[in-house]
A protein has these predicted regions:
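Membrane-proximal helix-loop-helix interfaces that form the catalytic/acceptor-binding platform
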Residues: 10-13, 17, 21-348, 353-506
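Short, Lys/Arg-rich, polar N-terminal cytosolic tail immediately upstream
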Residues: 1-10
């Protein structure tokens, strides 16, 4: 009786703990959202596309080296029309996606992992850097995660079943619609479908395949339509291709690339830093061994989207890198959590129980504590990136008639352009520079001031110029000032996190 009572108490404690973690995760995301940090360059570039285009035009290749699924863009467009063109409207869908993802991850975790592993998985998912950060960024990666998790909740309970026509149409239509809202949806669908066939007995394989063909057909038609309407044209963007072109394996036998990509995954998109990514890899390996021995079918299902994505990467169709594969993070987190839980609970079954317990506690602390502490600080000190709004306000307040404004081209200039209209500036009031970013500070002087004057009529005959640098590494500020001092005299300076401006009297 006492044992049953203790087990019930532990079970209740774990349930309440998991609930508290979910509430904490939602609270942190809301704190970040309410802090209303300025859009940084990449967000601003996407925002300008959303604001300046019609719904039909959002089907065309985006300007400013941006790419996003049409469904995501349409929701963003709708929110700006309903709630106004501002940061809150633009980040509302990623926020909703982040909160829904927490709940969906909990549901998937209940199916996939043990009761001990579940709160570990939830706290990692809630607090790890990139699952948290992208929940409040104007990008599609938060909704990628949400859609991947929702599709798992939809399809996994239907594995190895002969479905009636209503359910076939349901999964077919929902999958077809999801493809338009998330580019990697096709890998989740293909992976789960393949995993289903692998786990189905040989006698049932043909029946299952024939039964699901209408749904698969709808998925393929939807993906083919979106591919030829949007993705194929995006792939013609040389800048985007160059940005990700080195992220593919050289050959199908490029195992070095595979090992490197596997290792990098734990740093980004999972978000384990420095030595902690190695510890996370260890926990993942332990968890994988546990799954393969105790729950091989679940392991195949969890890893099936990963293998489908890798197949596309080896075909040079989708980069296996960074934020583009954030949607795979939940599956790895579940395995990591089970690895930690295995060590924590093995003391009941091993003569070396103390060592397993110590190892489990150590791994749990090393992997959870840094992310938990970092996430907790956001309650009081929300994360900022490139706070250009106060910089523009300062310029507006201190600007004199005839002053010029110079800002580097690319994302930083898009950031300034997004906010310029809100402060009464038109495009004729500032010049976009010829440098996308000041990566090499020496270029600033070697190109010479003449190029700055010749690039735009707005800069000609300007005696005072405000040089605005959002997104420039703080360490490079002295180099910028050094070169500016050679072409003028500094009159003023103002800085905010991730952005600063110099006012110079030109020689």
């Amino acid at each position: 009786v006492n044992n049953l009572s203790n087990k019930q108490n532990i079970s209740d404690f774990l349930k309440y703990l998991t609930l508290l973690i979910i509430i904490f995760g939602i609270f942190i995301r809301l704190s970040q959202y309410v802090s209303n940090r300025a859009l940084w360059g990449d967000e601003a570039s996407l925002a300008l596309n959303i604001v300046d285009r019609s719904y039909a035009e959002l089907l065309q290749p985006l300007d400013r080296n941006q790419a996003a699924p049409p469904g995501f863009l349409w929701i963003e467009k709708l929110f700006t029309q309903l709630f106004g063109n501002n940061e809150y409207s633009l980040r509302l869908f990623p926020l909703i996606s982040g909160i829904v993802s927490l709940i969906a991850f909990y549901k998937l975790g209940k199916w996939a992992v043990s009761a001990i592993a579940l709160p570990i998985a939830i706290i990692l998912f809630a607090c790890l850097r990139y699952t948290l950060y992208y929940a409040t960024e104007l990008k599609q990666y938060s909704s990628d995660v949400m859609i991947a998790l929702l599709l798992c909740l939809l399809l996994i309970p239907l594995q190895q079943q002969i479905l009636n026509i209503r359910r076939i149409l349901l999964i077919g239509i929902l999958g077809a619609v999801a493809i338009w809202f998330s580019h990697p949806t096709i890998f989740v669908l293909a992976g789960l479908a393949s995993g289903n066939l692998i786990l189905t007995s040989n006698q049932q394989k043909k029946a299952i395949l024939i039964n699901r063909l209408p749904a698969y057909f709808l998925w393929l038609i939807s993906f083919g339509s979106m591919y030829f309407l949007t993705i194929a044209r995006v792939m013609q963007n040389n800048s985007l291709q160059n940005a990700w072109g080195d992220e593919y394996p050289n050959t199908i036998f490029d195992l070095l690339w595979l090992l490197d990509s596997f290792g990098r995954f734990f740093s980004r998109p999972l978000g384990f830093s420095t030595i902690f990514d190695g510890i996370a890899i260890l926990a993942f390996v332990i968890g994988s061994v546990f799954f393969i021995k105790k729950k091989p079918n679940k392991f195949i299902i969890l890893m099936s989207p990963v293998f489908a994505t890798l197949a596309a990467t080896y075909l040079h169709k989708y980069p296996f890198r960074g934020r583009l594969i954030l949607f795979l993070a939940p599956f790895f987190i579940l395995v990591i959590a089970e690895g930690i839980a295995f060590l924590l609970t093995s003391f009941n079954h091993s003569k070396h129980h103390k060592y397993f317990l110590i190892a489990g506690i150590t791994l749990a602390c090393l992997l959870i504590a840094p992310s938990l502490i970092r996430a907790g600080t956001f309650v009081f000190y929300p994360e900022n990136k490139h706070e250009i709004r106060p910089v523009i306000e300062y310029i507006k307040t201190h600007q004199k008639p005839g002053d010029g404004i110079y800002i580097g081209d690319g994302g930083p200039a898009d950031q300034f352009e997004y906010y310029a209209g809100k402060y009464g500036y038109s495009q004729s009031d500032y010049a976009r520079g010829y440098l996308s970013e000041l990566v090499d500070a020496e270029k600033f002087y070697e190109q010479g001031w003449q190029q700055f004057k010749n690039q735009s009529n707005q800069l000609k005959n300007k005696q005072r110029i405000w040089f605005v640098f959002p997104g420039l590494n703080k360490k490079k500020e002295p180099f910028v000032k050094l070169h500016l001092d050679r072409i003028g005299k500094k009159l003023d300076y103002f800085s905010q996190p991730g952005a600063f401006t110099y006012l110079y009297q030109m020689k």
